[in-house]
Design a protein with these regions (language model features):
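Core catalytic lobe of class I
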Residues: 1-194, 201
Length: 202
């Protein structure tokens, strides 16, 4: 999950968030700034901490926050800022609804050890998408460890359909939700391209 920097400009029609450290392109809608939605405690140029805010909100709602996982990118998006380091990681969170939950640690075991909490995975472009697409390798261990074959996978933000594609490849069913109507064709085409094994598709 990406994060953003705080840039409060009430009444000027500017975006509340100037820069997204996830893609260097994504901004919150202008209407947020026009409404003057200032978040308490945040100062100009503060890193908002959206991933952790979401994780803590889910925990407060009753979920169990079991682990944070670092997605380390060796080929991150370049940034022009000169007063901090270039952002090269994002967060994944392992959450559960109960204390006892399904987790197949052996399904994602590395050759000589159990999988660590820092995942080194390069970003990959998808030819038909003009936005950032996360790589299938990021989804594979999540689905392998968190579900069994014929289980149902839910992706509430479907985007280009990466999660659905991986779920289908691993013998799972899937449901995806996407507000942007234009992505429907992209999703169908991407899943339709899937032939043979997941490794062959990647």
């Amino acid at each position: 999950m990406g994060d953003s920097y705080y840039n409060y400009r009430p009444g000027k029609g500017q975006a509340l968030v100037k820069q997204s450290v996830a893609t260097n392109k994504q901004d919150l809608p202008d209407k947020c700034a026009r409404r003057g939605n200032k978040l308490d405690g945040l100062k100009e140029k503060d890193l908002i901490g959206i991933p952790w805010m979401l994780a803590f909100a889910l925990r407060a709602d009753g979920w169990y926050l079991r682990q944070d996982i670092i997605w380390n990118k060796s080929n991150p998006m370049p940034e022009s800022v000169r007063d901090r380091c270039t952002k090269s990681h994002e967060y994944l969170f392992l959450l559960s609804k109960n204390q006892n939950y399904y987790f197949d640690v052996d399904a994602i075991k590395e050759p000589t050890r159990r999988k660590r909490s820092v995942w080194n995975i390069n970003k990959k472009a998808y030819k038909d998408a003009h936005f950032a697409v996360y790589p299938p390798e990021l989804v594979i261990p999540c689905i392998k460890a968190g579900s069994e074959k014929n289980d149902l996978i839910l992706d509430p933000f479907m985007g280009s359909g990466t999660t659905a594609m991986v779920a289908k490849s691993l013998g799972r069913h899937y449901i995806g939700c996407e507000l942007h109507e234009g992505y429907g064709k992209l999703i169908k085409n991407r899943i339709g391209e899937l032939r043979g094994t997941l490794e062959e598709f990647i």
